[in-house]
Amino acid sequence: MPCDRKTSPDQHHALQIHRHHHRRKIRARVDAMQSWSAPSVPALPGRGPQLRLFDSADRQIRPVSPGATATMYVCGITPYDATHLGHAATYLTFDLVNRVWRDSGHDVHYVQNITDVDDPLFERAARDGIGWRELGDRETDLFREDMAALRVVPPRDYVAATEAIAEVIEVVEKLLASGAAYVVDDAQYPDVYFHAGATVQFGYESGYDRETMLALFAERGGDPDRPGKSDPLDALLWRAERPEEPSWPSPFGPGRPGWHVECAAIAMTRIGNVLDIQGGGSDLIFPHHEFSSAHAECVSGERRFARHYVHAGMIGWDGHKMSKSRGNLVLVSQLRRDGVDPGAIRLGLFAGHYRQDRYWSPAVLDEAQQRLHRWRSATALDGAPDATDVVARVRRYLADDLDTPKALAAIDGWAEDTLSYGGHDRTAGPTVSAAVDALLGVAL
């Protein structure tokens, strides 16, 4: 097992005294969060090729080789300001993964969480004069509506952090028992932290040096200056109860989960110790995915939590990354209210490669709407050129690290030929329409 630190006898005894009482109280919670309605996905003849993806940890494109059931965990939203196009780009990326896997013959066990207990949520709720649960429920409902409108295949398990408290506590108990975690010497707020050096492989997922880690840790929710920590990089596992904050009972005192351990616990409980893919936006590479992986590896003894770490690029608007803190958000719900076809939103985001940081603009949307119109016009004709080659190319391009620009260009070429010259194959239009629906999630 990578974690070789041990708790003191006193720490172990204290945990044993409280463990069973608190677990009985908390385990009454069950997964109740519902996802969204699933779109109808056509089954295409034959099977698509094996998926290859860029792995952030290995820094190269390599085959994803799941068993009969492919497994994927994608970090979900913190439910406020949902759903902006940065969110949409991430979840559409992994919707493509889901669709390509299914097209190649795999069942897919996809898990997504909702971080419905976190500081930014509390801050926004306080600013708006609304309860944090009410805000979280409202924004989660909006997110689900947006995902359904965008025809995203829903996860099999859609789990709120507040539904997984018992699972988090169990993971924290194991980390404390192994010595990979510790309680800070603070009588008022005895928070529980994870030793960043608890696994020998820590840092493999991001590949960042310590200086970069410290800078990103401070920028992305970490607390390097917290007194009492063994190392500035040590990550919060359990935040001791504070005034005006929600809390749950635990063997180590009332409090609430840290961010990273929520995902580790939810993924391990529903999928297992090793995932085929852990995914999210590129801003999650560090610290979130580095630490959630380290937590899981320390508990399981596995060398690597995910066989592939896959990250989508950021979406910008008006010269800056789209973010809640900056306030430069383009919301899916607003585009929908403006009458924009969700298929055009998908095509606009697919016009760039998923790993690239890219900008959304009126020109991007206009091009996507024109493309959608051309494709619909072409597939509606009674006769068209044979579609066998274009469908094979789309399958091949998407299986090659989700190369949507090439896939879109292939369909553009077929549509242009169809509109310019026509054809005699009356099945070609429906064939292309089914392929675009099944693989790209766009209804023609």
UniProtKB/Swiss-Prot annotation:
Residue ranges of the motif 'HIGH' region: 77-87
One cellular component term (GO) for this entry is: cytosol
GO molecular function per UniProt: ATP binding; cysteine-glucosaminylinositol ligase activity; cysteine-tRNA ligase activity; zinc ion binding
Report residue spans for region: Disordered: 1-21
* SUPFAM superfamilies reported for this sequence: Nucleotidylyl transferase
- Motif 'KMSKS' region is found at 321-325
Assigned protein family:
Belongs to the class-I aminoacyl-tRNA synthetase family. MshC subfamily.
Designated name of the protein = L-cysteine:1D-myo-inositol 2-amino-2-deoxy-alpha-D-glucopyranoside ligase
**Lineage summary:** Bacteria, Bacillati, Actinomycetota, Actinomycetes, Mycobacteriales
Q: What is this protein's gene name?
A: mshC
